[in-house]
Amino acid sequence: MFLQHMMGILYHPKSEWGMIRKEHYSTFHIFLAQISILAAIPAVSLFIGTTQIGWSIAGSEYVKLEVGSALMAGIAFYFAMWVAVGVIAYAIHWMEKTYGGQVSFDECMVLTTFTATPLFLAGLSGLYPMLWFNVSVGMIALCYTVYLLYTGVPIIMQIPEDRGFFFSTSILTVGLCVLVGLIATTVVLWGTFLPLSYSAY
């Protein structure tokens, strides 16, 4: 059912949001059966791409990560995405009453997870870790994620579309803050606790 909804949310989001709203998923189920799989897509893809293919900024010398270094970074990135989804869902649940929402934390997790699906799937671009390619795919996924957010909030939160617009904007702001925080934390970890080892060829 999850895979069916995941495909449906990509091709006909408005009707799929309505179907998702009629079902109930627990937070435990979402983390165990959905986030655990989706978060593995970018983590595993980047591990393979950075250790087996490598990347080149100037188009000449290619750089690869050592397997041990990439493995630690991949594991940290994997669990960081768990935390990011949980933080955004908590923020949605905390803000919902301001905009007239009366749903449970489980519904907030559902909204967060399905909205972020394009970003998780875009992680497949990590198999070819070239900056221009990853940024292009990431921007396309981000645009569609924003579209899913604005269409899904009024349906899942059961609020009018005008309130849903402002609520979606608030959620988007939180999401961008979490993204910046995730990037900053990654840079700090790479420079201190998880230093990366490279090899050029």
Where are these regions (language model features)?
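Hydrophobic alpha-helical transmembrane segments and adjacent short intramembrane/lumenal linkers
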Residues: 92, 99-174, 179-181
